[in-house]
Amino acid sequence: LIGGMWSNLWHATVTGATVVGAIAAWHGWALLTTSRERLASRFAVIIRYYIAAAFFLVVGATLAGFVTAAMFDANAPAWLAEARDRLTVAHALAGVAGWVGLTMGGTLVTLGPTAMRTRMDPRAVSFATSALPMWVAALLVAGTGAVTGSMRVTSVGLLVVVGAAALGVGVPLVRAALTKGPAEYGAWSLMLGAAWILVAGAGASLRAFEAADATGLRTAFLAWMPILGAAGLGQLFVGALTYLMPVVIGGGPSAVRVGVGVLEAGAPIREAARNVAAVLALAVASLSGTSAERLTTAAWVVLLATYLVDIVLLGRGGVAQARAKRAASSSPTTQGGRRG
């Protein structure tokens, strides 16, 4: 798919998109059939989030095929070429708010409280269950509005999607945080990343309401896309990795403490710098002039530098924890215990 896009071979791109869609459909069907038996539990709603995400990946892959044909096929029908921007917006909605959003939203229902080292809110499953059909229906409405060129319909659909995400994921996380707030870098990154995604979604809804057509929406939302990626999705990934990596490496409590200690180095400064830089970048995005350009550049340098530090610390933390794990396994006490 990617190779076809880079080489302008639209047949290869469509083939790749078809394969991706078919695999996603297969995966979704497997989850659906398994969830009725082996995965049936109190948390089965999380699996339903993943099934819905797989559905929207199929939709996004299908739309990607049409967009590719509109872009690269000289013999594409006129109606398809004219619908390119509308289909692109619908494709983005299915991919970001559907596939990525539903996957991360469902995961955060359980991962968020776990990273905060507290219990899930007693009503978390109820909130997530109530929000899912609202999320899916509103996203279908938003996508339909995009395809038909009705930006107001897209705006309303997006706003309801944001509300559903806030209800199903945000409210339970906040209620859990009120019991025991985030105290570690991973938990803070997860919470702030989720907050930025909701902000970006609300911004997209506003831009859609103001836009005259899909082309105008694409242009107006360009300033928000880096924020969605760097401040939203990026922080979610970093937060998940920061919490999960020490757990996966293991080695016992002492080894885990070594890894966590490295990952927590300068955590408040990194978190503050990243999010203040994101706020600054968003605030000056609509301004013009040399000063605004310099502020924007400085903000992005700081923001990206925090991720560079994250990468370095993840590497150092993994190495340090692995060494502590090996040292613990080869200590005389451990060896003696094994012989006994």
Language-model segments: residues:
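Hydrophobic alpha-helical transmembrane segments of multi-pass integral membrane proteins
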Residues: 1-340
